[in-house]
Amino acid sequence: MSKKSNKKLHIICLAAFAVLLCAAIWLLGRVCQPKYMSGVLEGAMTQEYYNEENPHDVIFVGDCEVYENFSPVTMWEEHGITSYIRGSAQQLIWQSYYLLEEVFERESPKVVVYNVQSMKYDTPQSEAYNRMTLDGMPLSKHKLDAIKASMTEDEDMVSYLIPFLRYHSRWSELTDEDFEYAFRRDPVTIAGYLMRADVEPMTKLPTAPVLDDYTIGDTCWEYLDKMQKLCDANGATLVLIKSPSLWPHWYDPVSYTHLTLPTSDLV
């Protein structure tokens, strides 16, 4: 065999090995990545949206205060409004923005509803919550931008793109669920609404804490402005809400001057 043939065979073998290695890493990542099919279901919510086939009149974005407080089924049955909730646990405003960018690539909702609670956070907060929102997004510029904006100091971009690098330590903890749902997921929501059967009445209103700073951070204002411009560019009306909740505390209207968010902007 000539040297030229040997070199060609060597290149083919290296290419085949690289392909097999990449396939193995991808497969192991699918197996080791958390499935969120039991226990904490919130991590499975983001990717459900991509199975939607019909457009929606209204899109909700935000944290648990949207996916636990609004029912798309009720909105349809009582008002004939089609809607979907693109919510996730502790969804930060920049994550809401990039999820909304995805929405406008797929459909043209008339109204976007954003719950402002997460504007209390002006910096990345938690890798665990980041993962529950971002891991379900398909690879795209929107996902890359969302990861970059969301990473805490101890995180890196590569581990989001190659899940096995982050989740390989789960190998000894794998259960039947990890293999059963390696390539599929069961729905955990109804149009993004996470139905709960363990709701309890309020028995005590928490004491409102005294905050060191009542202002909303510049990053939050920046992304709220970008969200408004994105909606305007796509012919959608942006509605800001704050859902009723025990926490964070509802401060008296006279205190809103400290929050720097005009009461006229709240629904």
Model-predicted regions and their roles:
Residues 1-8:
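N-terminal Lys/Arg-rich, disordered targeting/topogenic segments
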Residues 12-30:
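Hydrophobic membrane-insertion alpha-helices, especially the h-region
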Residues 33-47:
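Alpha-helical transmembrane signal-anchor/signal-peptide segments
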Residues 129-234:
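Secreted/periplasmic serine-hydrolase-like ester/acetyl group-modifying domain
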Residues 228-252:
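Active-site segments of SGNH/GDSL-like serine hydrolases
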